[in-house]
From Swiss-Prot:
<keyword id="KW-0436">Ligase</keyword>
<keyword id="KW-0067">ATP-binding</keyword>
<dbReference type="InterPro" id="IPR041107">
    <property type="entry name" value="Rimk_N"/>
</dbReference>
<dbReference type="InterPro" id="IPR013651">
    <property type="entry name" value="ATP-grasp_RimK-type"/>
</dbReference>
<keyword id="KW-0479">Metal-binding</keyword>
<feature type="binding site">
    <location>
        <position position="262"/>
    </location>
    <ligand>
        <name>Mn(2+) 2</name>
    </ligand>
</feature>
<feature type="binding site">
    <location>
        <position position="260"/>
    </location>
    <ligand>
        <name>Mn(2+) 1</name>
    </ligand>
</feature>
<dbReference type="InterPro" id="IPR023533">
    <property type="entry name" value="RimK"/>
</dbReference>
<keyword id="KW-0547">Nucleotide-binding</keyword>
<feature type="binding site">
    <location>
        <position position="248"/>
    </location>
    <ligand>
        <name>Mg(2+) 1</name>
    </ligand>
</feature>
<feature type="binding site">
    <location>
        <position position="262"/>
    </location>
    <ligand>
        <name>Mg(2+) 2</name>
    </ligand>
</feature>
<keyword id="KW-0460">Magnesium</keyword>
<dbReference type="Pfam" id="PF08443">
    <property type="entry name" value="RimK"/>
</dbReference>
<dbReference type="InterPro" id="IPR011761">
    <property type="entry name" value="ATP-grasp"/>
</dbReference>
<dbReference type="GO" id="GO:0036211">
    <property type="term" value="P:protein modification process"/>
</dbReference>
<dbReference type="GO" id="GO:0006412">
    <property type="term" value="P:translation"/>
</dbReference>
<keyword id="KW-0464">Manganese</keyword>
Length: 301
């Protein structure tokens, strides 16, 4: 097969592992920087050009689109979909999962467990907003944040009010969540491919750090999931419409709580923590599904 990987840097661990896994199975692979693509969208024959050449005859596309380039990256992916190329994750599913408010509303509607969460833009009563989620301590997040950036633990009501007011001064949309103390600064990343959890790791925050992101100095280790955790992770990925997803859970006294569903989960942490060939499993999934062109929206979303 001819497989394209939408990525801005082929030396990144995840991208290089996907190249390695695909080539070892005899596939032709090309890394495509979505920002350098340009498209003809007003033609009966939709086209994508990259470095002066038309991109043709691709069987599948693997989107590794960074959060900062979601708008244009998903536009390019949508164009591939319109050309009949099989997307590992569809453009509409990626945009759905990248919108934190929309994704949490969808998960809530389907009864998925989550921390009590408040959303706000310019709350005229910060005290009432905090009361809504049970009061301090609370976790306050910028809606556009990634990798633990823009996430603050406010341990007192006064601190929480100050952080909310500071974020309001930035004209930023915010999310206020209850703090799950029993999680102990750890979360679980479940890696879902094709409706199955194929690997899972526990991420523990550095000492004195409540954020468990590996980018913030956290550590990762193999973890055994409960049946409920496995079921929750698969359901969350399915609700987003993602074939490949990283579902982040917290262990709480009331069961697993979903924090986020990531449409472009990194491979380095999960492969090193579990010893599994996750990149190879993604290519295996493409081999089984690309020929059938099983895509729900066909680029209409």
């Amino acid at each position: 097969m001819k497989i394209g990987i939408l990525s801005r840097n082929q030396s990144l661990y995840s991208t290089s592992r996907l190249i390695e896994a695909a080539e070892s199975r005899g596939h032709e692979v090309k890394v495509i920087d979505a920002l350098r693509c340009y498209m003809n969208i007003n033609s009966e024959k939709p086209q994508i050009h990259f470095k002066g050449e038309e991109l043709v005859d691709y069987d599948a596309i693997i989107p590794r689109i960074g959060a900062s380039v979601t708008f244009y990256g998903t536009a390019v992916l949508r164009q591939f979909e319109m050309m009949g190329v099989y997307p590992v994750n569809e453009s509409v599913a990626i945009t759905r999962s990248r919108d934190k408010l929309r994704s949490m509303q969808l998960l809530s509607r389907k009864g998925i467990g989550m921390p009590i969460t408040g959303f706000a833009s310019k709350p005229d009563d910060v005290k009432d907003l905090l009361d809504m989620v049970g009061g301090a301590p609370v976790v306050i997040k910028l809606l556009e944040g990634t990798q633990g950036i823009g996430v603050v633990l406010a341990e007192t009501r006064k601190a929480a009010e100050s952080v909310v007011e500071a974020f309001m001064g930035l004209k930023a949309n915010i999310m206020v969540q209850e703090f799950i103390k029993e999680a102990g600064g750890a979360d679980i990343r479940c890696f879902v491919i094709g409706g199955k959890v194929i690997a899972a790791m526990k991420r523990q925050g550095a000492e004195g750090e409540f954020r468990s992101n590996l980018h913030r100095g956290g550590s990762a280790s193999l973890v055994k999931l409960t049946p409920e955790e496995r079921k929750t992770a698969v359901a969350a990925a399915n609700i987003m419409g993602l074939n490949v997803a990283g579902v982040d859970l917290l262990r709480s006294e009331r069961g697993p709580l979903v924090m986020e569903v990531n449409s472009s989960p990194g491979l380095e942490g999960i492969e090193k923590a579990t010893g599994k060939d996750v990149a190879g499993l993604i290519i295996d999934f493409i081999e089984k599904t690309a020929a059938t062109k099983r895509t729900k929206t066909r680029g209409k979303g």
